[in-house]
């Protein structure tokens, strides 16, 4: 049993969301009173934000389970990115700059899509959700890393560690699913342009995005429960800058075979299914582009897929480097910096790629700037 009596008793007192309720209010106000695009977003936007805000409740349950499991460890020590004091300031400045660009880029992209009627299509709706996922994922890891940079002992409580594990796994699954959904959307747009409105109706878009969010939260919760159901009674030092599932398994002093099998099965299933959807979509897209007689049509189709292909290459390339390298060349320091790229850099690059390389996004931004300039006159 994953849940103990103690954790079940405490369920009724966990009413307030872990994150600030203003996020929910912002989301409701943000998407209210819009016509075309709001019909595509509102049915699930509030529910998604509320589920994300209440994600900490899941981690509180995990925390109560760990307490009832009589773990001797009440906190973990993170070694951080580096122990060199001279490099700490450099890392802090770089991480802070990246996080600010990530927040500005992704939130700005969401606002731009919201206020631009020409971007109120399923493709940009999915892009809006990818921007939200990237901002959420970066916010799960980066702020705590910045706070810990100059601390001598980079300790993190059991509850905060559970929150990070739950949040990071949720983010990883969301990213995989959003990239898969966007690949299918591009397949329909390029291979069946005349049937796009029929094959990508509003109801289907809502179902795909909502199911992605719900599935991601469930996977994050289940994996975190399995992790903190184990007993931690020995070493508590994690050679990482955030609470990661794999190093935590190595610290457990109870049987980890079930957790390891669960991690391998769920992660393998998610990556395999996502990769299959992406590969099949782009195989059909490639055949469709080859059959096009117009050079302009080919260029337009390629530009539609270029940004998404770059995001997929970065994401799966980093995963391959982190988990599929030979043991002989395996290094914890390499894993650490690959994790920086995976959790911090990619969310920033996605917002830049989809804004700077997308002609429609740039045109929408130019129109808004021109409108603001004319209003000042």
Give, region by region, the residue ranges found by the protein language model:
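Transmembrane helical core of 7TM receptor-like proteins
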Residues: 1-377
């Amino acid at each position: 049993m994953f849940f103990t009596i103690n954790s079940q008793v405490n369920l009724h007192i966990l009413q307030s969301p872990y994150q600030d309720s203003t996020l929910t209010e912002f989301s409701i106000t943000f998407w209210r009173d819009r016509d075309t695009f709001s019909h595509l977003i509102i049915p699930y936007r509030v529910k998604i934000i509320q589920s994300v805000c209440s994600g900490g409740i899941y981690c509180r349950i995990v925390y109560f389970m760990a307490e009832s499991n009589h773990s001797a460890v009440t906190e973990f020590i993170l070694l951080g990115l580096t122990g060199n004091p001279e490099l700490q300031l450099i890392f802090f400045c770089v991480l802070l700059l990246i996080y600010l660009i990530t927040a500005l880029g992704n939130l700005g992209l969401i606002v731009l899509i919201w206020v631009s009627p020409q971007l109120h299509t399923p493709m940009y709706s999915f892009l809006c959700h990818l921007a939200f996922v990237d901002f959420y994922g970066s916010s799960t890891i980066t702020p705590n890393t910045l706070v810990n940079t100059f601390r001598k002992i980079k300790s993190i409580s059991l509850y905060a560690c559970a929150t990070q594990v739950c949040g990071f796994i949720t983010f990883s699954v969301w990213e995989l699913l959003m990239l898969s959904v966007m690949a299918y959307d591009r397949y329909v747009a390029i291979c069946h342009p005349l049937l796009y409105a029929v094959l990508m109706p509003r109801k289907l878009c809502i179902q795909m995005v909502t199911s992605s969010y719900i599935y991601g939260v469930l996977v994050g919760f289940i994996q975190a429960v399995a992790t903190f159901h184990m007993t931690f009674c020995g070493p508590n030092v994690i050679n990482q800058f955030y609470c990661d599932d794999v190093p935590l398994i190595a610290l457990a002093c109870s049987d980890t075979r079930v957790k390891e099998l669960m991690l391998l099965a769920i992660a393998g299933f998610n990556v395999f299914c996502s990769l299959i959807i992406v590969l099949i979509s782009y195989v059909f897209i490639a055949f469709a582009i080859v059959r096009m007689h117009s050079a302009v049509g080919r260029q337009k189709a390629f530009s539609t897929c270029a940004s998404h292909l770059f995001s997929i290459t970065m994401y799966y390339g980093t995963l391959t480097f982190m988990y599929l390298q030979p043991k002989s060349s395996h290094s914890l320091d390499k894993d650490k910096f690959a994790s920086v790229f995976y959790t911090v850099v990619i969310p920033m690059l996605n917002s830049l790629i989809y804004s700077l390389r997308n002609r429609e996004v740039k045109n929408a931004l130019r129109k808004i700037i021109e409108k603001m300039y004319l209003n000042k006159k």
